Amino acid sequence: MVILGIDPGSRITGFGIIKIHDNKLYYVASGCIRITETGTARRLKQIADGITEVVNTYAPTESAIEQIFMFQNPGAALKLGQARGVAMCTLAINNLEVSEYSAKQIKQAVVGTGGAAKSQVQHMVQSILGLSKKPPEDAADALAIAICHYHSSKSLARIAGASRVSQKRIR
């Protein structure tokens, strides 16, 4: 299983890719798509092109993205929503299902507390994946999203397995 995590942003969109083998997590790649274009349509296309390049290069089998949280500034929420929508659409065009997680769920899965600081997320991502240095914030967030997805999908698989066992016992 190869998981692509996306941390959408209107200026910087982070991506992180992990591979799972024998229930162990391995770092594959991470980085930032830095938006340099001007004009909304060109900026959104740059996000789509960057994600398409990542998908074509690393061939993820699953993807996950951070949900939008409430902003005080409606303009910022709109821009983030546009970036997130383009990211999700690009993943769907590339035949990837997209799972969504809140910032609190991601922090809980990686750090153990939903109120963790960004520096704590960076530190735990570095530790979990055995990296020699902390990844940049946006890349660390994207890797954390991928890690969260792995833990969530593993839990759901256990629940589904337990449900099948319970149904067999009932019959």
Curated annotation (Swiss-Prot):
Residues annotated as binding Mg(2+) 1: D7, D138
Please give the SUPFAM superfamilies that the UniProt record associates with this protein.
Ribonuclease H-like
InterPro entries documented for this protein: RNaseH-like_sf (IPR012337), RNaseH_sf (IPR036397), X-over_junc_endoDNase_Mg_BS (IPR020563), X-over_junc_endoDNase_RuvC (IPR002176)
Q: Which family does it belong to?
A: Belongs to the RuvC family.
Which sites are catalytic? D7, E66, D138
Subcellular localization(s) per the UniProt record:
Cytoplasm
- Can you name this protein? Crossover junction endodeoxyribonuclease RuvC
